Amino acid sequence: MIGLVGKKVGMTRIFTEDGVSIPVTVIEIEANRVTQVKDLANDGYRAVQVTAGAKKANRVTKPEAGHFAKAGVEAGRTLREFRLSEGEEFTVGQSISVEIFADIKKVDVTGTSKGKGFAGTVKRWNFRTQDATHGNSLSHRAPGSIGQNQTPGKVFKGKKMAGQLGNERVTVQSLDVVRVDAERNLLLVKGAVPGATGSDLIVKPAVKA
């Protein structure tokens, strides 16, 4: 089953009939418009390309304008592609709503995490700090050794060090679907999802459900 493009509205909480508080993230999923359908004969694989939201006319490039016009849909703020499984069929110009998640229990949500700039190893990788006293006056949050000696004579790739934290693609898996509000195009999932309020998200049925 394909996924949909949505927008993070923010977090709130809802209550069950028993009075239990559930923290939820509200995701607005406006109708996704199909801009292109790819098939085995022409493209070598089956997929559907969708757009969502709106984009100012002066922000749409000529190639984009032609692409949207050919599909007969309004220009959107993003283009995303989802692989199709056997039996799934879509047509160009078709509108797909949040209702496709009505029978889905768990979803995977992908977004771009909040950027936090250049961070040290304690914040970025949860390294332990060194002694606050006992003769230590300069190396409280220092990373410590980053290698061995003449053998191997290098720092191994992937070594956890200070650097850019956040602002990367992150997927949170198997979040419970709490509510699907088709009237207001809202999807409520339990827990937090990556990204800032207003950022784009990709919501798919969970692969580990």
Curated annotation (Swiss-Prot):
Modified residues (N5-methylglutamine): Q150
Biological process annotations from GO: translation
UniProt PTM: Methylated by PrmB.
GO cellular component: cytosolic large ribosomal subunit
Disordered, as annotated region: 133-153
Highest taxon listed in the record's lineage: Bacteria
Keywords carried by this UniProt record: Methylation, Ribonucleoprotein, Ribosomal protein, RNA-binding, rRNA-binding
GO molecular function, one term: structural constituent of ribosome
NCBIfam families with a match to the protein in the record: L3_bact (TIGR03625)
Subunit structure: Part of the 50S ribosomal subunit. Forms a cluster with proteins L14 and L19.
Biological role stated in the UniProt entry: One of the primary rRNA binding proteins, it binds directly near the 3'-end of the 23S rRNA, where it nucleates assembly of the 50S subunit.
Family membership: Belongs to the universal ribosomal protein uL3 family.
PANTHER family in the cross-refs: 50S RIBOSOMAL PROTEIN L3, LARGE RIBOSOMAL SUBUNIT PROTEIN UL3C
Protein name listed in UniProt: Large ribosomal subunit protein uL3
Organism in which the protein naturally occurs: Pectobacterium atrosepticum (strain SCRI 1043 / ATCC BAA-672)
Gene (UniProt): rplC
